[in-house]
Swiss-Prot record:
Residues 433-442 have a biased composition (Basic and acidic residues). Residues 1-25, 55-85, 151-175, 180-199, 225-244, 252-327, 339-372, 419-442 are annotated as: Disordered. Residues 409-442 are cytoplasmic. This is Syndecan-3. Residues 45-387 are extracellular. GO terms for cellular component: axon; cell surface; membrane; microspike; plasma membrane; protein-containing complex. Residues 289-303 have a biased composition (Polar residues). The gene is Sdc3. Cell surface proteoglycan that may bear heparan sulfate. May have a role in the organization of cell shape by affecting the actin cytoskeleton, possibly by transferring signals from the cell surface in a sugar-dependent mechanism. Coiled coil: none annotated. Interacts with TIAM1. Interacts (via heparan sulfate chains) with PTN; this interaction mediates the neurite outgrowth-promoting signal from PTN to the cytoskeleton of growing neurites; this interaction mediates osteoblast recruitment. Interacts with MDK; this interaction induces SDC3 clustering; this interaction induces neuronal cell adhesion and neurite outgrowth. SMART domains: 4.1m (SM00294).
Amino acid sequence: MKPGPPRRGTAQGQRVDTATHGPGARGLLLPPLLLLLLAGRAAGAQRWRNENFERPVDLEGSGDDDSFPDDELDDLYSGSGSGYFEQESGLETAMRFIPDIALAAPTAPAMLPTTVIQPVDTPFEELLSEHPGPEPVTSPPLVTEVTEVVEEPSQRATTISTTTSTTAATTTGAPTMATAPATAATTAPSTPAAPPATATTADIRTTGIQGLLPLPLTTAATAKATTPAVPSPPTTVTTLDTEAPTPRLVNTATSRPRALPRPVTTQEPEVAERSTLPLGTTAPGPTEVAQTPTPESLLTTTQDEPEVPVSGGPSGDFELQEETTQPDTANEVVAVEGAAAKPSPPLGTLPKGARPGLGLHDNAIDSGSSAAQLPQKSILERKEVLVAVIVGGVVGALFAAFLVTLLIYRMKKKDEGSYTLEEPKQASVTYQKPDKQEEFYA
């Protein structure tokens, strides 16, 4: 009995140890238990899916796509399948938006140098600015080109050019002349802050941003071209100033993009030609000219511009002369039929001497869909057709009567055939003789 108490003490000590070490052991056991529970639930879910997945396959095939929107079911049921293509289309649209943004990005810096003008370090501007810098000798022909293109005034540009020329005159000297083009290059890009308004007004028709880029370049080139040509005396500077207001820096922007606004300048003379053609044609025949010859002239203008007045003018005149020779009734027919009546007037000219009214009616009916009415009227008017119809009716009646007579004759034949049927009765009587013989044998 004595060893009992110490055992109890040891047991209590063990319990205390388990009590102290219990939380750590439980913390270690919890994660595997949770993993087991999750695995069991996943297995149950998979079984449930398999059970529900086997039912539609066994029952109706792809009829239960709505109740099972899983990816596996979508792979097997190719009924819908359009969702994949929609996703691909979304990706394609995203790829399409990316190049739009890439194209829009260069337009922003293209507009920035026109407003801020200081960041002249764009790739296009560097390449263009490097040429006039090291080659000051080739710059004077640029000035001559500008003088040839002089057409529009700009006072602000002239004042700024005078200031730059005076500064260059004050800094007379060999070493300073090398710095003069640099200062002019720095001041010149600041000058287009004023003329971009006029430049944009001239380039609105072209709707091209390239016309805005060469503004600082052209101004810098002209400024550099003028500064090295300025000698030490200020008198020559005044002469260059008188030449400077004539070029007017904005004209350079309009002279370079001439290749761009050519469609605009060509459209303006086309409009003038369009206006002149109907004006010249409305005098002899206003109704027909507005309908037929104008589209031909427009087509010729779009194809070949210089050949428009040569081909369109005389052709329209000859057409007018031919149409004036026609009567007023032919003109009305052309107005009703439209462009499809061009071949009809020459056809109408033939029946002028014979039957103008009937010829016009025939043309109108040929163009319309009432061609079936004329044959009906002609059939009613022709006596031959009526006679043929009457004869056909009589012949049909006779044929019907003949058929009736044939039927009656056959009926009579059937009646006569009844008498002939009685003859076999006699034969039947003769056939009864063997019956008597049989009776005799019996």
